[in-house]
């Protein structure tokens, strides 16, 4: 009877120990489940951060491409402006040369007109001298008349030359007015071009500043890209580590579940044995 009681006490203690071990296993299982959930949550957070980093990386790449496109457009615009400026400077030079030639023609016509005027004055003086001498010397009248006719011819010729010179002068004046008008237009265009050049200079300065800023932003983007790439690698490493940790925890959970199942089976066997023992005692 004492042996049976000792056996019952031993079985009871074994049962209590089995219950304690089962509770410990269940606690470990709950802890593992909690750790597993935490790791899975960390893994989800890392995956979200990884997606955000990928979006930031794509956005920065798009901004960098846009900055490069704007820089190429500004450089092309500067080249077009420089080409147009060179063409306008060439046109101004041609207008100045045309004006110089017009001034030379005007000066030549003026000199010819002065020569014709001097010849007419000389003829007029000769005619007056001949008229005054005709009263005193009748014998020289025929000669003087001949000289007068010649003088008239010279005067008429000079008059024709004067008219021709006047006509050429009028043409020259028209050419001069046109040249002056072209010169005024050219001067106005020069002023306009100077203003445009000032604006272009300011724009070029702004573009240089923008280019420097774009270069700085590009350096910053490259640094950001390197940082994001490193962070991406770190995130991938952490994700891999988290996956390995989850795998280990899953194995531990499986092991603890197996232990719990074994403890439950041992508990069931102990309970069945106690029930059988109690039934035998009740039979006595």
Swiss-Prot record:
Any keyword Glycoprotein? no
Q: Where is this region: Disordered?
A: 105-131
Q: Which InterPro entries match?
A: Tropomyosin (IPR000533)
Keyword list, A-Z = Allergen, Coiled coil, Repeat
Q: Which stretches are annotated as coiled coil?
A: 1-284
The record's comment about this protein's domains reads: The molecule is in a coiled coil structure that is formed by 2 polypeptide chains. The sequence exhibits a prominent seven-residues periodicity.
PANTHER family associated with the record: TROPOMYOSIN
UniProt function note: Tropomyosin, in association with the troponin complex, plays a central role in the calcium dependent regulation of muscle contraction.
Say which family it is in.
Belongs to the tropomyosin family.
The entry describes its oligomerization and partners as: Homodimer.
Q: What is this protein called?
A: Tropomyosin
């Amino acid at each position: 009877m004492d042996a049976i009681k000792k056996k019952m006490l031993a079985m009871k203690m074994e049962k209590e120990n089995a219950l304690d071990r089962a509770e410990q296993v269940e606690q470990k299982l709950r802890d593992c489940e909690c750790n597993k959930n935490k790791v899975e949550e960390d893994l989800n957070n890392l995956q979200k951060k990884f997606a955000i980093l990928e979006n930031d990386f794509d956005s920065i790449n798009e901004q960098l491409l846009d900055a490069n496109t704007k820089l190429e457009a500004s450089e092309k615009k500067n080249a077009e402006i420089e080409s147009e400026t060179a063409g306008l400077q060439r046109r101004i030079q041609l207008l100045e040369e045309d004006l110089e030639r017009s001034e030379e023609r005007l000066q030549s016509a003026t000199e010819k007109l002065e020569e014709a005027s001097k010849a007419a004055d000389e003829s007029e003086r000769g005619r007056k001298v001949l008229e005054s001498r005709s009263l005193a010397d009748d014998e020289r009248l025929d000669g003087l008349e001949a000289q007068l006719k010649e003088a008239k011819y010279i005067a008429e010729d000079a008059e024709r030359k004067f008219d021709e010179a006047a006509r050429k002068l009028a043409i020259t004046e028209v050419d001069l007015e046109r040249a002056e008008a072209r010169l005024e237009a050219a001067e106005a265009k020069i002023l306009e071009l100077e203003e445009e050049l000032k604006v272009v200079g300011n724009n070029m300065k702004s573009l240089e500043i923008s280019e420097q800023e774009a270069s700085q932003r590009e350096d910053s983007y490259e640094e950001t890209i390197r940082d994001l790439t490193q962070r991406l690698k770190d995130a991938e490493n952490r994700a891999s580590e988290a996956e390995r940790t989850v795998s280990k925890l899953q194995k531990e959970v499986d092991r603890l579940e197996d232990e719990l199942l074994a403890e439950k089976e041992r508990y069931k066997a102990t309970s069945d044995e106690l029930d059988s023992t109690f039934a035998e005692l009740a039979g006595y």
